[in-house]
């Protein structure tokens, strides 16, 4: 979440005339994140988050907003899109598709403990179950086809060692078979900065704009690679097990998922290594923006490749 497209107080006042939310009191840009423009919007009716979508088209976005509504109505702590006076959750502001959603309680954590990992593992499992009844098709815009294309873009910038690792990982993914794994709607970006913790509870899961249909294990791997990683980019076994045990208690993990676990952690690390390399070498213009360090996921990928047996050994206590 960053500010690529500037919105003035007066523009926001005018836009809010299409909603029944009262008078605008405050408008504040949110600098964290890397894809869309976001503002905190405070009116005399409450606090909301405004998102202007920098990459998605207006045709793609209703599915994401419908998914958030679907999950919120089933008890998942996620933002609820606010409909305007015409009954639509999606509008346009400064030439960009735009939406308002409810603002949730809590804050993101820099140093999650095992109890926080267990809490997010439980919520992710509940989200996967709730998402099973969401019928709209949503393809993974950061899937294998995107990874192959992005690898070709960033490869010229890599040193010889990382170029070899990139090629080896692409070859691994070419033969990595996930067809037998349980599939469904996934968040696909469940980092710490996309979760608001309210004490030891999950106050909210935000930023559903990479959500898609894919292997549920991929969603778990993306989250574990951020929530359960030590300072040296190795996995913390205590936090991993807390996360997986809590998830497994809600949606039992399968033997096929256990066998695929080390490989899925590699795929998840590769996806974010590539996106961070792409953001570094091909940045978007913006007012309050920042690119995240790709070296973090480079190290996570190296560990995932080297530590396959140790990764397999840290799993749920019962299948």
UniProtKB/Swiss-Prot annotation:
Q: Which domain of life is it from?
A: Bacteria
- GO molecular function, one example? ATP binding
Task: Name the chemical reaction catalysed here.
Answer: L-homoserine + ATP = O-phospho-L-homoserine + ADP + H(+)
Q: State the organism's lineage.
A: Bacteria, Pseudomonadati, Pseudomonadota, Betaproteobacteria, Nitrosomonadales
Q: Which UniProt keywords apply?
A: Amino-acid biosynthesis, ATP-binding, Kinase, Nucleotide-binding, Threonine biosynthesis, Transferase
Quote the SUPFAM superfamilies the UniProt record gives: Protein kinase-like (PK-like)
Q: Which Gene3D superfamilies does this one have? A: 3.90.1200.10, Phosphorylase Kinase, domain 1
Q: Does the keyword Transferase apply?
A: yes
Query: What stretch or stretches form a coiled coil here?
Result: none
Family the UniProt entry places it in: Belongs to the pseudomonas-type ThrB family.
Q: What protein name applies here?
A: Homoserine kinase
Biological process GO terms, please? threonine biosynthetic process
* Annotated source species: Methylobacillus flagellatus (strain ATCC 51484 / DSM 6875 / VKM B-1610 / KT)
Q: Might you give the EC number(s) for this enzyme?
A: 2.7.1.39
């Amino acid at each position: 979440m960053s500010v690529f497209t500037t919105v003035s107080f007066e523009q926001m006042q005018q836009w809010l005339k299409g909603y029944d939310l009262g008078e605008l009191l405050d408008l504040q840009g949110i600098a964290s994140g890397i894809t869309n423009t976001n503002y905190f919007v405070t009116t005399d009716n409450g606090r909301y988050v405004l998102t202007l979508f920098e990459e998605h088209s207006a045709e793609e976005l209703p599915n994401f907003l419908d998914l958030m509504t679907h999950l919120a109505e089933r008890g998942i702590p996620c933002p609820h899109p606010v409909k305007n006076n015409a009954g639509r959750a999606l509008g346009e502001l400064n030439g960009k598709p735009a939406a308002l959603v409810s603002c949730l309680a809590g804050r993101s954590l820099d140093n999650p403990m095992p109890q926080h990992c267990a809490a997010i593992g439980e919520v992710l499992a509940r989200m996967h179950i709730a998402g099973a009844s969401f019928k709209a098709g949503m393809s993974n815009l950061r899937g294998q086809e995107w990874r192959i294309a992005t690898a070709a873009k960033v490869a010229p910038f890599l040193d010889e060692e990382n170029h070899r690792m990139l090629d080896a990982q692409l070859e691994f993914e070419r033969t990595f078979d996930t067809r037998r794994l349980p599939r469904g709607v996934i968040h696909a970006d469940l980092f710490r900065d996309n979760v608001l913790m309210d004490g030891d509870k999950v106050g909210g899961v935000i930023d559903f704009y990479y959500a898609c249909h894919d292997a549920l294990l991929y969603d778990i791997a993306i989250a574990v690679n951020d929530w359960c990683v030590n300072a040296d980019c190795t996995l913390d076994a205590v936090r991993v097990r807390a996360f997986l045990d809590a998830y497994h208690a809600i949606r039992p993990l399968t033997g096929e998922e256990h066998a695929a676990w080390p490989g899925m952690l590699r795929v998840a690390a590769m996806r974010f290594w590539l996106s961070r390399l792409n953001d570094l070498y091909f940045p978007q213009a913006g007012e309050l923006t920042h690119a995240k360090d790709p070296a973090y996921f480079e190290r996570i990928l190296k560990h995932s490749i080297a530590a396959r047996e140790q990764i397999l050994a840290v799993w749920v206590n019962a299948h």
